[in-house]
Design a protein with these regions (language model features):
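Periplasmic/cell-envelope proteins involved in peptidoglycan metabolism and beta-lactam response
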Residues: 1-303, 319, 328, 403-413, ...
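Beta-lactam-recognizing serine transpeptidase/beta-lactamase-like catalytic domain environment
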Residues: 2-13, 82, 211-224, 269-334, ...
Length: 627
């Protein structure tokens, strides 16, 4: 027994070594596995943890956007022009709806919301869906009907979320200036588009917890970020003056059977502030896709298919277009104010210069005549303006010369956008440059044909003629407002440049008053106020109708202390005449008289002699090239 112990000891050595190696291998394997686990945890926690967290939150949270109200728009006198009204968006979560009541829900909701029952039931049967839109922005009555139906029938899973939409409380009023918004409350045209970033608020959000099956948990789990209303606008537009302009313009359009859209503008002469701006016929920005003009709507309804769709789109784009800013026109004899001011300022003529008007005048082989072939004989510059004499202004243009004419044309801002804070202003007008202008082109441009400018450009240029020679930038927004009504930014008037000398401007004011007292502008006279103006009746050179005319008039009052300018243009009137002095001048007089009284400008007490003298003088008729 004793002799076997060494042998047993030798036999246990390999076993011990084997066991040790086994332990070491086991420990090593454990270490490797542990290291792998640590590495995986490191990767999951630090490298991809954010991604998994977001996925988990996405499954556990449902976020509902709470749209912010757009900023409100007010007139200068405080009238609310654009605001927001409550509406409701209806959504459903099919997986939360009782399966046995899906058919009942589809039938009832389809009836209330005027939807297709079969299609609605198909949506509800998709139990994987957690969200489907039923109707977007419905009125309170519809939302209440859905709420009552669901409550009465024990239907869950239908969500009624309060929303807001743009609302224009005064309908068509100022529509072409305000513009409108789309279904997402983003500006599409007008001030809504130009100031979209300013008016747009910061949306809020409601985070709602959901369980593993997608069902909404108790309201105590909700988190809400409150929406922030956008900034508001206070305009230079005075609601009272805007009403004066729209009422007078609408009456004239109906009275004289105006075929195309007509324009009216009222500016503050010394600042460029737009007090009123209208394009007729207007449209309702609450229903911008409904064609407001009856004739245009009838023409669209008479078509079908693709033709109708194209005609509808064109009609909509036409009614949305602010013609006062976006369209170009031949200004006609109103432009003679620019030619006259330029020639006086350049020293090419004086107010006492005389010109002769016979049967016609020949320029490079082309004959020009005055309206109705009138012969005015010898006349001063003032008389030529009173008579709107084409032949005299052809001679004035020739004395000024094409280079100086083009220089003043540019200086009066007629080759560039006015810079008004509205979209869709043309980048440039249509005109001749000096290197492309021959004697005939200079002659026709001198009395207001052969060039096309915007209505607003013409109004701004005449302001410079009478306000001492300063070209002011027209503008519409006076103040940017915080939601509480406090002023965030005030816009100051901008003088672009000095165009003519103050003395020239003073002379032009006297001559414009003579036009209203003794010439073709007598229909613009206002009892107790001194008024200056000029008429125009321009031929539409790009129209297929050779008889198509634009009857226009521009008036300034009081002319001895210029404050307000009114430009009215009736596009294609079909009346007893097409003369601007007969059709448009009375509109200017009505608007300016109401404005002067409203603004508290006192009437003169003794104007009888001037009125009687003016009434005793014969009016010089005006036509397409002599108005």
């Amino acid at each position: 027994m004793c002799g076997s112990k060494p042998t047993d000891a030798l036999r246990t050595l390999p076993e011990r070594a084997f066991r040790l190696r086994a332990r070491l291998i086991a420990v090593g394997l454990c270490a490797v596995c542990f290291a792998g686990l640590i590495g995986r945890l490191f990767w999951l926690q630090l490298c991809t943890g954010g991604w998994y967290t977001q996925r988990a939150l996405g499954q556990q949270l449902r976020d509902t956007v709470v749209p912010a109200d757009r900023g409100k728009i007010y007139s200068a006198d405080g009238a609310l022009l654009a605001a927001n009204s409550s509406c409701w968006t209806l959504r459903a979560s099919p997986r939360e709806m009782p399966e046995e009541k899906l058919a009942l829900a589809a039938k009832g909701l389809a009836e209330i919301l005027e939807l297709d029952e079969a299609k609605l039931l198909e949506k509800f049967n998709d139990r994987r869906s957690n969200d489907c839109l039923l109707r977007y922005r419905v009125e309170r009555e519809t939302a209440d009907a859905v709420r009552d139906f669901c409550a009465a029938n024990g239907i869950t899973g239908v969500r009624i979320n309060q929303d807001s939409k743009r609302w224009y409380p005064q309908g068509e009023f100022l529509a072409s200036v305000l513009g409108f918004t789309n279904v997402d409350n983003a500006g599409v045209s007008g001030l809504e588009l130009e100031y979209n970033d300013t008016l747009t608020g910061q949306n809020g959000v409601v985070l709602t917890a959901v369980n593993a099956w997608g069902y909404t948990l108790a309201q105590s789990y909700e988190t809400e970020l409150v929406p922030v209303e956008g900034s508001g606008l206070r305009l230079t537009i005075d609601a009272n003056i805007q009403h004066y302009l729209e009422n007078a313009l609408n009456y004239a359009v109906q009275e004289h059977h105006v075929a195309a859209r007509s324009v009216g503008i009222v500016l503050e002469v010394n600042t460029g502030a737009v007090l009123a701006m209208a394009t007729t016929p207007a449209y309702d920005p609450n229903q911008p896709r409904v064609i407001a003009d009856k004739a245009a709507r009838a023409a669209v309804d008479a078509l079908s298919g693709k033709e109708r769709a194209a005609a509808l789109q064109l009609a909509q784009q036409t009614q949305w277009r602010n013609k006062a800013v976006s369209d170009l026109y031949e200004p006609g004899s109103v432009f003679k104010l620019i030619t006259c001011a330029a020639a006086l300022d350049a020293g090419a003529i004086t107010r006492h210069s005389t010109f002769y008007c016979g049967d016609s005048i020949s320029v490079a082989g082309t004959r020009f005549h005055c309206a109705n072939h009138k012969r005015h004989g010898s006349q001063t510059v003032t008389q030529a303006l009173e008579n709107s004499c084409n032949q005299s202004f052809i001679q004035i243009g020739a004395r000024l010369g094409k280079q100086a004419f083009c220089d003043y044309f540019a200086a009066f801002g007629l080759r560039e956008p006015t810079g008004i804070d509205l979209p869709a202003e043309p980048k440039k007008s249509l005109y001749y440059t000096a290197d492309r202008m021959g004697p005939v082109e200079l002659a026709s441009c001198a009395f207001g044909q052969s060039s096309k400018i915007s209505y607003l450009e013409m109004a701004a240029a005449v302001c410079a003629v009478v306000n001492g020679g300063k070209l002011m930038q027209p503008y519409l927004v006076s103040d940017i407002l915080a939601p509480d009504g406090s002023i965030l930014r005030h816009n100051q008037p901008v003088c672009k440049r000095q165009v003519i000398q103050p003395a020239t401007s003073a002379t032009m004011r006297e001559m414009m008053e003579a036009v209203v007292l003794y010439g073709g502008g007598r229909n613009a006279q206002i009892a107790g106020y001194r008024v200056g103006g000029k008429s125009g009746t321009s031929q539409k050179l790009d129209s297929a109708d050779e008889k198509a005319r634009i009857a226009s008039f521009v008036a300034v009052a009081p002319i001895d202390d210029p404050q307000f300018l009114c430009l009215v243009c009736l596009d294609e009137p079909h009346s007893w005449t097409t003369a601007g002095g007969s059709l448009s001048a009375p509109v200017c007089a009505e608007v300016l008289e109401q404005t002067l009284v409203y603004k508290g400008v006192p009437r003169a007490t003794d104007t009888g002699s001037a009125d009687a003298q003016a009434a005793a003088l014969p009016a010089d008729g005006d036509s397409f090239d002599g108005a």
